[in-house]
Curated annotation (Swiss-Prot):
Record-linked CDD domains: AdoMet_MTases (cd02440)
Keyword Transferase recorded: yes
Recorded metabolic or biological pathway in which this protein acts: tRNA modification; N(7)-methylguanine-tRNA biosynthesis
Positions with a binding annotation for S-adenosyl-L-methionine: E59, E84, D111, D133
Classification of source organism: Bacteria, Pseudomonadati, Pseudomonadota, Alphaproteobacteria, Caulobacterales
Cross-referenced Pfam families: Methyltransf_4
Name listed for the protein in its UniProt record: tRNA (guanine-N(7)-)-methyltransferase
Catalytic site: D133
Known catalytic reactions: guanosine(46) in tRNA + S-adenosyl-L-methionine = N(7)-methylguanosine(46) in tRNA + S-adenosyl-L-homocysteine
Residues the entry annotates as binding substrate: K137, D169, T206, R207, Y208, E209
Any GO MF annotation of the entry: tRNA (guanine(46)-N7)-methyltransferase activity
Length: 226
């Protein structure tokens, strides 16, 4: 069963959409390459985007695209779908796709919740949410991406046994996420080392992570869809 685009109300889970002018080369890629690799803006079957894909992975809020591109490069047999509302991040990501000649990346420039709403049930094999906007002030917590209703939507689109990795460098957001994800009976911790500060073996460090803007060392959380 597919779900149509859902209204999100006035609350955005992300901040400003553009911080600086896009470089001419990146703008050219936004104009030419992005339309070729864009995700449909309506309910779709991921396998139609890459019929030969062995798995389908989703990264929500890919920032500059370093992590997404690196994961896609290591697994050319995987269709990597990424969603990012920040124009500069999308511009950086399409540059990575072009420079690395990646054929297995598809991008949505906009709210990831739309993509999740368009996906069929049990269609995603692995999910990444890496260092999302923390909205660390208490009065802004309601804007955080990880909310019970969204966790339920993630449970809908993830296959049984699918992995879900979340990373943050804000201690409160790590605890917030653990509480809300595990409150959904569809999820459990992946293993005894599901909460860690040391980067997992397959992690790719990003420029945002290196800036150390949070209030703690990075926390990596690994969940499994039951």
């Amino acid at each position: 069963m597919t779900h149509p685009q859902q209204p999100h109300g006035p609350l955005r889970s992300f901040g400003r959409l553009k911080s600086r002018p896009v470089k001419p080369r990146q703008q050219a890629l936004l104009d030419t390459l992005l339309p070729q690799i864009a995700v449909p803006t309506a309910p779709f079957q991921p396998r139609d985007l890459m019929p030969e894909a062995q798995e389908v992975w989703l990264e929500i809020g890919f920032g500059g695209g370093e992590h997404m591109a690196a994961q896609a490069g290591k697994r050319p047999d995987v269709l990597m779908i990424g969603a990012e509302p920040f124009v500069n991040g999308v511009a950086s990501a399409v540059r990575h796709v072009e420079e690395q000649a990646l054929k297995n990346v598809r991008i949505h420039e906009g709210d990831a919740r739309d993509v999740v709403g368009w996906l069929p049930d049990a269609s995603i094999d692995r999910l990444f949410i890496m260092f999302p906007d923390p909205w660390h002030k208490a009065r802004h917590n309601k804007r955080r991406l990880v909310q019970p209703a969204f966790v339920a939507e993630l449970a809908r689109v993830l296959k049984p046994g699918a992995g879900f990795r979340f990373a943050t460098d804000w201690a409160d957001y790590a605890q917030w996420t653990v509480e809300r994800v595990l409150a959904d009976p569809a999820f459990r911790f992946a293993d005894a080392e599901a909460v860690r500060n040391a980067p997992p073996a397959d992690h790719v460090t990003t420029r945002y992570e290196e800036k150390k803007l949070g209030d703690c060392a990075p926390v990596f959380l690994d969940f499994v869809r039951i």
